Swiss-Prot record:
Organism of derivation: Arabidopsis thaliana (Mouse-ear cress)
Coiled coil: none
Cleavable signal peptide: 1-20
Protein name, per record: Non-specific lipid transfer protein GPI-anchored 16
Chain intervals for the UniProt region annotation (Disordered): 134-182
Cysteines joined through disulfide linkages: 27-72, 38-56, 57-98, 70-107
Localization, UniProt: Cell membrane
Entry's family note: Belongs to the plant LTP family.
UniProtKB keywords: Cell membrane, Disulfide bond, Glycoprotein, GPI-anchor, Lipoprotein, Membrane, Signal
Changes seen on gene knockout: Female gametophyte disrupted development arrested at the four-nuclear stage.
Amino acid sequence: MEGLTLIVVMMSSFMLGGQGQQISTPCTSSMISTFTPCLNFITGSSGGSVTPTAGCCDSLKTLTNTGMGCACLILTANVPLPTGFINRTLALALPRACKMGGVPIQCQAAGTPLPAPGQVPFLIAPPPQVSAFSPGASKAAGTTPTQAPAPDTPADGPTGPTTKSGIRPVDQPMQPTGLAQSSTSPFLPLLFISLILLNL
């Protein structure tokens, strides 16, 4: 019975370890924790202060010296933080506010955002182009365009939700639970086979 318990514990540790799909970034948790003095400034929650604290500038200098890749991701607002959204304008202004010059040259190419963790969605193919030799093109060429009726919009302007400029929402997909991870684990059939063999 003790051998069975040991096997179950070992198999469950294999199943639960390392199954989450995570994107590898140059930012470690210790790098982000040393950058915490700047989080209020780059998220816009510093109470309207336009200058970062001395501790923030010191941590930015340390981060650019030890982890330029992580600093670039933070300064270009391309790393999601658990504390809130990064205001890209404030993040790009941080090096100048700390009297370090502009955004480092190494960060200029870091303007592309990271993909969200999880599966890649299927893309819808664009509609086919109408060529001059297709039947649809000859019918379209023979008709004259008509004026479309004006849409019913109020004279005040468009109605609908307004967005705040400078704040970019980040969609964070839910992480799979332990049950979902273990059901897709390749070690699950091995666990069942070992349990059957131990019962024989």
